[in-house]
Amino acid sequence: MATRLEEHLACLYAPTPQHPEAWIPAGVVAGLGADVCDRIGLRLHQALAEPVRHLVDAGGRRWRPGLVAEAIEVLGGDSERYGPMCAALELAHTGSLMVDDVQDDSPLRRGLPTAHGVFGVATALNAGTNAYFAMDRAIRMTLADDPLLGGALRDAFLAALRSAHAGQALDITGHHTEMEHAVATGDARQVLELVRLSHRLKSGAMPAAGFEFAALLTGAGEDLRQALVAFGEAVGTAYQITDDVADLTGVTHHGNSTKQVGEDVRNGKVTMPLAHAVTRLPADRLRDLWDVVRTPTASEQERADVRSALLDCGAATVCAQEADALLHRAWDRLEAVLPRSPRVQRLRDMAWRTVHGRTVA
């Protein structure tokens, strides 16, 4: 699947300019001369494809399409037939990273300057959101003769996009009120609930949709479909929890940093380790850390001290345990209804590596 996935990505987002109808509905440019279409195709490629390819070509783990393809195979389907949709899931994720990097003013992604740093904010935002529409093209390419199934897949995908945007909205607005309450009272329940919900929506919804795709494409029964969706959500949520931890130590690939260390602390975010630290640090120490996190002018040394404290108090360990517990619960439910297949263990191993084998997003 890995090699073919790159081919499917290139089919949806070609590395060279295409006819304008790769991007806009057929007939819109009818009657225009070939030279005009060539110029339009070049401009659309520069404004829509190149910013996305910048991030796609930088690598990434491709775990979302990989897991969905493996789930399709476990269920007796042919993942290669649905390769374009698996690729479109990766493109949607890539687009969300581009938008997220603008919102966080991140300088680095996958070891390269972020898309907005290279192409500008306006282009990165437009190209990033345009990547969501690759799924519609992929469904048309794959299921042109099955509008009912295509409609069900679009419903699942759009529901995931709505959830992801709601999660991002919660992430942007932050959980400062709840964190302030936790610091004042020592009660972390509210802030933990909101951080968990944000993670489920922002990071769990799209993998859940991918696993729902696997169920729909293979005609799985309702119990199995629900278990697949729950497992996909668990994998995505657990991945985000461990990503919160990875932000404290940095993420490297072949010895190079793939993104800036401590971005969450620098951006004043309330993360899972910070929320779990409420019950693991003395009240005065917690107050000092929280004051640094919410102060935009805090020094790099102060921020480094926050990261060290969150690691030393055991909050990061608790996050890893929570991620594992999520995975185990969802897997136990799924395994009980999966068909017998030698690929079942492979699916499980891939999920655990996804969550705990941190390299690049």
Language-model features and meaning:
Residues 13, 17-21, 161-174, 280-286, ...:
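Proline-centered turn/helix-capping motifs that create local helix->coil transitions or kinks
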Residues 107, 246-256, 286-293, 345, ...:
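A glycine-biased, small/acidic residue-tolerant capping/turn segment at secondary-structure junctions
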Residues 118-119, 129-145, 155, 178:
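A glycine/threonine-rich phosphate-anchoring loop and its flanking beta-alpha core
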Residues 109-130, 181-202, 226-230, 252-280, ...:
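Divalent-cation-assisted or electrostatically stabilized phosphate/pyrophosphate-binding catalytic cores
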Residues 37-88, 134, 138-139, 192-235, ...:
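Alpha-helical phosphate/pyrophosphate-handling elements in metalloenzyme active cores
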Residues 34-42, 57-61, 126, 144-252:
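All-alpha helical catalytic cores of prenyl diphosphate-utilizing isoprenoid enzymes
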Residues 2, 6, 64-65, 92, ...:
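Hydrophobic faces of stable alpha-helices that mediate helix-helix packing
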Residues 1-94, 98, 102-117, 171-189, ...:
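Conserved N-terminal diphosphate/IPP-binding helix and adjacent helical/loop segment
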